[in-house]
C-alpha cells in the first residue's frame, strides 16, 4: 500500500491493506443468513471487547450521526441538557441539543483541563426541580 499516512484524529482511521482487499469483494447481502451469522458473531465479540453482557448496538454512521440519533431520541424541545464541555466534542453535544430545541447549559473548562466532579455534583444538586434531563460529555 503506497499511502501509509498515520492519522492521529478521531476519524477516518487508516484501513489495513487486507481489509481494503476484502472490501473489494462483492458485499454479503444484509438480509442473508450469512450476514446474520456474521452480525451475531460481531455483536458477541463486541460484548467481550467492552466486557459487558448487555446489548451492543452497531450504528452505521459517523460519531456525529450517533450523537444526533441519541439526542433526537432522548430530549424534547424545551428540555434542559447539561453539556460538559472540555473540548470540541462537548461543545458539539450542546449544539446538537440546541438544534433539537433543547436548552443546553454548558459546564465548561479550558481545553486540556478536566471538569471537577465536585463541580458537576454541585450543579446537579442545585437542580432541585430535576429540570436537567440528560448530561452529555
Task: Go through each PLM region and give its residues.
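Conserved beta-loop-alpha segment that forms the PLP phosphate-binding cup at the N-terminus of a helix
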Residues: 53-86, 90-94
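Hydrophobic N-terminal alpha-helices or hydrophobic patches in metabolic proteins across all domains
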Residues: 1-2, 7, 31-32, 110, ...
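A glycine-/small-polar-enriched, mobile loop at the entrance of the PLP active site in fold-type I
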Residues: 4-60, 64
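Active-site-proximal loop->helix
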Residues: 92-103, 110, 121-123
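Glycine-rich phosphate/diphosphate-binding loops that line cofactor/substrate pockets in enzymes
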Residues: 49-50, 72-79, 124-131
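Active-site phosphate-binding strand-loop segment of PLP-dependent enzymes
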Residues: 115-137
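General beta-strand structural signal in soluble alpha/beta enzymes
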Residues: 7-9, 57-60, 83, 106-107, ...
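Generic hydrophobic alpha-helical segments
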Residues: 42, 46, 70, 120-124
Amino acid at each position: 500500500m503506497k499511502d501509509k499516512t498515520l492519522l492521529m484524529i478521531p476519524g477516518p482511521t487508516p484501513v489495513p491493506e487486507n481489509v481494503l482487499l476484502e472490501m473489494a469483494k462483492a458485499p454479503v447481502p444484509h438480509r442473508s443468513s450469512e450476514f446474520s451469522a456474521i452480525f451475531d458473531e460481531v455483536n458477541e465479540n463486541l460484548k467481550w471487547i467492552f466486557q459487558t453482557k448487555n446489548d451492543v448496538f452497531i450504528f452505521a454512521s459517523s460519531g456525529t450521526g450517533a450523537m444526533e440519533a441519541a439526542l433526537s431520541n432522548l430530549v424534547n424541545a424545551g428540555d434542559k441538557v447539561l453539556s460538559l464541555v472540555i473540548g470540541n466534542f462537548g461543545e458539539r453535544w450542546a449544539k446538537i441539543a440546541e438544534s433539537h430545541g433543547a436548552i443546553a447549559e454548558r459546564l465548561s473548562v479550558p481545553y486540556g483541563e478536566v471538569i471537577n466532579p465536585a463541580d458537576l455534583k454541585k450543579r446537579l444538586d442545585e437542580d432541585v426541580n430535576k429540570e436537567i434531563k440528560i448530561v452529555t460529555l
